[in-house]
Amino acid sequence: MLKQANQQVLINHNRLLTRSFSRRFFLKGLIFSAWAPYSLSTPIKLELDKVKLYSAATDHKGDHWLVIANAKGESLNQLRLPSRAHQVFKHPSLPLVCVVARRPGKYLSLVHMNTGTLIKTISPSKGYHFYGHGLFTQDGRYLVTSENHIKSGEGRITIRDRLSEFSIVYQYASQGVGPHEIKLTNNGQTLVVANGGIKTHPDKGREKLNLNTMRPSLVYLELLTGKLLEKVSLPEQLHQLSIRHIDINQHNHVVIAMQYQGDKTDQVALMATHKRGEYIRLLNAPINSYLAMKHYCGSVCFDFSGMYAAATSPKGDRVTIWDTVKGNIVDELRCRDACGIAAFGKQGFVVSSGAGKLYHYNIEHKELKRLLPQTFLTAPPLVESKVNVPSPSKRMAWDNHLSISI
């Protein structure tokens, strides 16, 4: 425990050191390494009429939906889901989106993005459940998911082949417990896994069963074999800092957003970065900035430049912006129940909230602006062919994650 250890973690010249200092882990004493600067990418020109947003959502009755919307946040298609979902992501070339059930998940829904029609529902193998995240490989052939082997409590990566009706063709250990978000490096051959370290069991719902012994990790695996290429963890004193959500930029640098499972009075960093062959680097921020995040980050992503990252903290009603080259926070904004976030425009992000609102953030101007003229996301007008669409006058709350296709 941090309070018992009375230690402080310092990051200095890419080396992790521990030294006795105070009752808790104090952020103001951290020394942070910065990456060498690199030039910004060529800005992406957006054709707004082609932009689509994807997210799970919940209506006023507690029913759960897949929502596909345009750049203004106007709903284009919706599909009722059997239970609450977590992540939605698009196939790289086909008009197909995948919806992953929230942990402990029991379904994947494959949906036609242009019609909102359910194409296929996939259940986990016996003795497994989904952990809320997945991805399609760059060539679009394979569907990859993070899963839990219930009996052992160990994480698994499962790969299904689209060309054989999404049957399982590869399955291997995630090299940790509680794998959550997964990403591919730019070559498409290496899978990066955020092993949150938290053991769960479906019979216990969402109860966390191993908080005293949890050991999160960030691992790099060979995609089609599961061969361990690299595994990194934070120091033992931070073993309750769950590595949950990640993103990768064009330089294969990883940004990490974490959730702390320890004492509520502990003062800990929640944001970090990693580069192959190095240690995990915590990002610098004033103590009050991290405290305002309430030990919880909900989602994270890089902007298109790969230099800046944004993280949401729904428990703290915060959106924070980070310069990953300098290794520090550059902006923070209040945003009620902000959670979903995705890169959008030149050095910008779209943020979704549990209040049903959408915002655009511009790094240059440091402004967070509403995208919707109305307060809540609403459904399109009812038509006979869309019997599953709820009343357009009822509020819909965006769920944890947001995806964008251009």
Predicted regions and their residues:
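Repeated scaffold domains used in trafficking and secretory/extracellular systems
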Residues: 83-89, 129-135, 177-183, 240-245, ...
